[in-house]
């Protein structure tokens, strides 16, 4: 499996964010997208996820499921945690399993993998910032998808949380998955760097 983007151009609010950008990621590979604030790191992830329209170029996922769109084979995890405070930790994850569809994994196992199994009953309103991030990351294993698109995935995570997430990413890559992450900090795993130039 391989993700390819050729000659990508992004325009937002009438302003060209970037143009002529190429991106590649093969099965088992991580790509760290780096650059100044406003350079277009998040925009690139959103283009790949199909959340923004391409102003130029083409994106393809070769070797994926031909009956599914690229978006249906990808997890897009934004920098904000999309959680409902009134729902429990487990209920939030089950909501995402049902919303995303596909083949769900065991929700309790996914919560345990991110260190939240013991508070599955707790309303999300009571979670710390780091725990909220862990719950968001649990979506990645709760529904299996080969491509992970991650925007500042380690934000709010302490050292233990970062090590936990590095293990999740490593397991994903070792199983043939691929990931592209926009980040200002090291991911904690081997990753090829894609630098986007320019500033806001």
Curated annotation (Swiss-Prot):
Protein location: Cell inner membrane
Coiled-coil stretches noted in the UniProt entry, renumbered to this chain: none
GO CC term (a single one): plasma membrane
A biological process term (GO) from this entry: cytochrome complex assembly
InterPro entries in UniProt: AAA+_ATPase, ABC_transporter-like_ATP-bd, ABC_transporter-like_CS, ABC_transptr_haem_export_CcmA, P-loop_NTPase
EC numbers for this chain: 7.6.2.5
Lineage top rank: taxon: Bacteria
Enzymatic class: translocase
Binding site for ATP: 35-42
Pfam families: ABC_tran (PF00005)
Record function comment: Part of the ABC transporter complex CcmAB involved in the biogenesis of c-type cytochromes; once thought to export heme, this seems not to be the case, but its exact role is uncertain. Responsible for energy coupling to the transport system.
Name the UniProt record assigns to this protein: Cytochrome c biogenesis ATP-binding export protein CcmA
């Amino acid at each position: 499996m391989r993700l390819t983007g050729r000659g990508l151009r992004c325009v937002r609010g009438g302003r060209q964010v970037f143009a002529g950008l190429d991106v590649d990621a093969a099965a088992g590979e991580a790509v760290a997208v780096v650059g100044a604030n406003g350079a277009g790191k998040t925009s690139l992830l959103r283009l790949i996820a199909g959340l923004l329209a391409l102003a130029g170029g083409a994106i393809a996922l070769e070797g994926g499921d031909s009956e599914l769109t690229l978006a249906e084979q990808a997890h897009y995890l934004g920098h904000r945690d999309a959680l409902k405070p009134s729902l429990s930790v487990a209920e939030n994850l089950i909501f995402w399993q049902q919303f995303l569809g596909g083949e769900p994994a065991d929700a309790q196992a996914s919560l345990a993998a991110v260190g939240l199994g013991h508070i599955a009953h707790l309303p999300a309103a009571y979670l710390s910032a780091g725990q909220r991030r862990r719950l968001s990351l649990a979506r990645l294993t709760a529904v299996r998808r080969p491509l992970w698109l991650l925007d500042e995935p380690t934000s709010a995570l302490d050292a233990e949380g970062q090590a936990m997430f590095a293990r999740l990413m490593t397991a994903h890559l070792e199983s043939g998955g691929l990931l592209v992450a926009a980040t200002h900090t090291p991911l904690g795993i081997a990753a090829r760097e894609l630098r986007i130039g320019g500033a806001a």
